[in-house]
């Protein structure tokens, strides 16, 4: 058995401790899903202890002048590999459990030693500033295996946005992380500036950044634009339910034609109206003409205006242009012409199912 899915089973600390020992004793278990249970800091500490046992074994070269008796197929000197005594756990989902700061800190300590885990989901686990800083610090300073980290919806964050600094340092230094989720962190445009300047502009590996449901306003658009221009690996950016408005959207739009890697962009519910939506349509058109088209766009929840508006017509024409180029761009909006006017409708299953017309 490689995958253990025990999500939503009312498992508490005692059950988590027993499962931790089971995982420790069975090196074949690679995935443990405990989402939506009642695991607290004590149970989390047991799981962290098991993760910490899967440390790195560093082979030391023989002293100068001595011979190396390793055979041809043995690992080279100074090789680094997971300890055979530890777990082989690669995927851990503890989302929606009351881990608190103590549980998060225990996991941070484990990440400094662990050599197997690639996916860690800690969404809505009652983490506070101490745990957020500890986890980002561990990934920044001591971990080079983790590829996916979700710290969405913490219990506590700072009004002054100082929790953005550990995240920025982590992104700027880490060379393995591909997905980072920091939705519902209460981040404003000052925090985004920090994350972009000290994190994304230095990062060479991140492919997905999820910052949904934060407080990034119109001033944040310039920082998003800088990230799109300077980062060369970011493929998916989620800014759903922020406050970019028209000015922020225009800044983002101006950078779209300069990015060569962005594939998915989510700007739903950002208070964008006609001016911003028309600018974004022009930006996506530039991506098409530069042979760097997006694969997925989400825009519903912004104000396209009445039927026949410039925004509705501009976006209809952009998708027509994509079709003429043989490019498939999935979106959460579609268009119908009624009485000579372009109407915008929502797609519930993106790109497949129309469900109505708000405008």
Language model segments and positions:
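Leucine-rich tandem repeat or coiled-coil scaffolds
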Residues: 1-359
